[in-house]
């Protein structure tokens, strides 16, 4: 059984008799000497989708829920539902747009390496690869000879995500984006 300090974003945990999916974790360090470090977790109930914010001391023991990961690819949009297809047995997994809004900024039909987290036979979340390749649709014109400077400019991707890119990058180029930090890594 891991401590609260060992829990990572994207984990499925058991708390108060329910299974929750951890979406965000923030570390709170009190300014007093004797205060214990707290971990504030934003979690979603797997069964109902209800949001819950809980704080745990760093050494609180937390039960991990049983879950599995399945490799999948984005298939199509059906109204407000996004459908992903299992890469091995072609099982469709449906997600409501609001439940995966943040992940959708990185997902296109070409995105490889998606993982679906399944708890009790139901899909609960999408795990993104560490980096994805996206195409730039809107940015300021590239500046010749700007490769020596470290200045950046905003660029909008095909998914609507906006990141800072070097000045020498132009519209239509594919770039590699870090999905955890939302930052430009390199040309694709």
From Swiss-Prot:
SUPFAM superfamilies given in the database record:
Nucleic acid-binding proteins, Translation proteins SH3-like domain
Question: What organism is the protein native to?
Answer: Aliivibrio fischeri (strain ATCC 700601 / ES114)
* GO CC terms of this entry: cytoplasm
What name does UniProt use for this protein?
Elongation factor P-like protein
Q: Which Gene3D superfamilies match?
A: 2.30.30.30, Nucleic acid-binding proteins (2.40.50.140)
Parts of the chain that traverse the membrane: none
InterPro entries in UniProt: Elong-fact-P_C, NA-bd_OB-fold, Rib_uL2_dom2, Transl_elong_fac_P/YeiP, Transl_elong_KOW-like, Transl_elong_p-like_YeiP, Transl_elong_P/YeiP_cen, Transl_elong_P/YeiP_CS
Q: Which HAMAP family match?
A: EFP (MF_00646)
One GO biological process term is: peptide biosynthetic process
Q: Extract the SMART domains matched here.
A: EFP (SM01185), Elong-fact-P_C (SM00841)
Report the sequence similarity comment from the record.
Belongs to the elongation factor P family.
State the Pfam families in the record. Answer: EFP, EFP_N, Elong-fact-P_C
GO terms, molecular function: translation elongation factor activity
């Amino acid at each position: 059984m891991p401590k609260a300090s060992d829990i990572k974003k994207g984990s499925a945990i058991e708390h108060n008799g329910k299974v929750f999916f951890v979406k965000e974790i923030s570390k709170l360090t009190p300014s007093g000497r004797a205060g214990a470090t707290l971990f504030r977790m934003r979690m979603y109930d797997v069964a109902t989708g209800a949001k819950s914010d809980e704080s745990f001391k760093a050494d609180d023991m937390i039960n991990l829920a049983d879950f599995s990961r399945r490799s999948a690819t984005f298939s199509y949009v059906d109204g407000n539902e996004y459908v992903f297809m299992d890469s091995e047995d072609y099982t469709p997994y449906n997600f409501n747009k609001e439940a995966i809004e943040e992940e959708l900024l990185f997902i296109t039909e070409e995105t490889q390496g998606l993982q679906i987290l399944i708890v009790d036979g139901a899909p609960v979340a999408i795990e993104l690869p560490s980096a994805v390749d996206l195409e730039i649709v809107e940015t300021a014109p590239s500046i010749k000879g700007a490769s020596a400077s470290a200045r950046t400019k905003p660029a909008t991707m095909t998914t609507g995500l906006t990141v800072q890119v070097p000045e020498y990058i132009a519209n239509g180029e594919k770039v590699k984006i870090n999905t955890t930090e939302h930052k430009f890594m390199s040309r694709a």
